Design a protein with these regions (language model features):
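Active-site nucleophile/metal-coordination loop of metallo-enzymes that catalyze phosphate/sulfate
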Residues: 1-44, 51-110
Length: 110
């Protein structure tokens, strides 16, 4: 088994689930530059398909041709643990798991 090196880890940064709602809010309100490179728009549609993942979409694109051919789609990185509860909390709060406290199907009480 190989050792995990710091270089193997992805540092937090633009392009995570917690960046999505703040980026849309900034773009819609003019409250700063739109993060994530969102196009100018008066409204956005956010579609979540739980558990799909970009790799699954690429592998099974013949089963979801409409989703596979959508333009202006961006890959977003989820945090660890990559559970639905943690990911939805990141999207809804714009915060990382250590900040919002939902770490899997348990939560950290302040």
């Amino acid at each position: 088994m190989s050792s995990l090196l710091a270089a193997d880890l992805m540092p937090p940064g633009p392009g995570t689930l917690s960046d999505l709602v703040p980026a849309m809010g900034q773009a819609l309100t003019g409250g700063g530059p739109a993060g994530l490179g969102l196009p100018d728009a008066t409204r956005y549609v956010f579609l979540l398909v739980d558990g799909m993942g970009q790799e699954n979409l690429e592998q099974f694109r013949h089963l979801a041709p409409t989703l596979s051919e959508m333009e202006n789609c961006h890959d977003l990185t989820c945090y660890v643990p990559s559970t639905t509860a943690t990911s939805l909390s990141c999207i809804g709060t714009g915060a990382v798991p250590g900040r919002h406290g939902v770490v899997g199907y348990t939560f950290r009480a302040p």
